[in-house]
Amino acid sequence: MAERLGTDPATVVRIVRGLGFPGFREFQHYLHELSLAFATSADTMQSAAPSAGVSGHVADSLELDFKNLQALKNTLDTKRLADSAKRFYEARRIVVMGSDLAAVLAEYLEYHLVLLGLNAFAATSGGKIVHLTRNVTAKDIVVAISFRRGLRHTVEGVQSARRRGAHCIAITDTLLSPLARLSHETFLAGIGSNSFGASYAAPVALLNALIGAIGQHRQPLTLRIAKEISEEQRRGSRWYQE
């Protein structure tokens, strides 16, 4: 960087410290987080390493998913996630917010929470976010899912829920996300991809870990529900039979 700026490394370090960073490494980390927050679909495609044809692209895609999962495994504070999961059975109501592509994650989490008998609702549009967060209280949990800069409806939903005293949990991919600043807790999962779309391999893995932890807090109840589901899976009319 010093060479590109036409100065010496010591001057760069002084400038970085003047900006409030302890050192150059922290400044580099901030720039990396900034690049994640403001990345676009075109950026991810253009930054991807050139691959050997379509088959090479497929291999690279799987490799990136593996890296995202490995990063989640290496950085996730499992005790903090377990403590967070305990709150779900204590909550009066759980609102899971996620718009656009993140709507599939919100509905995925809602489905499993309802399966466990919890009072959960997915808010996947601007209107539902407004109406569901308008009535939350300190007895409720709001899970907000959005990546990069964060979608406006989701961010404003957290602002509304926080004002009303709800416990807010953010799932995003960078600490520079406004969700991270607004929420009581933040869990990170990378969505890096070599294609035009985001990869949700790591976010789904994070949700699976959270769902599993919630179930473990009341294991006898979870086991009873699992047995009921198993019976329906064996004999239920909604399953196709030859």
Place the predicted regions along the sequence by residue.
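HTH-adjacent hinge/linker in prokaryotic transcriptional regulators
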Residues: 3-80
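Glycine-rich beta-alpha loop segments
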Residues: 74-92
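Glycine-rich phosphate-binding loops that contact phosphosugars or nucleotide phosphates
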Residues: 89-217
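Generic structural signal for well-ordered, non-membrane alpha-helical segments
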Residues: 5, 24, 54-58, 62-65, ...
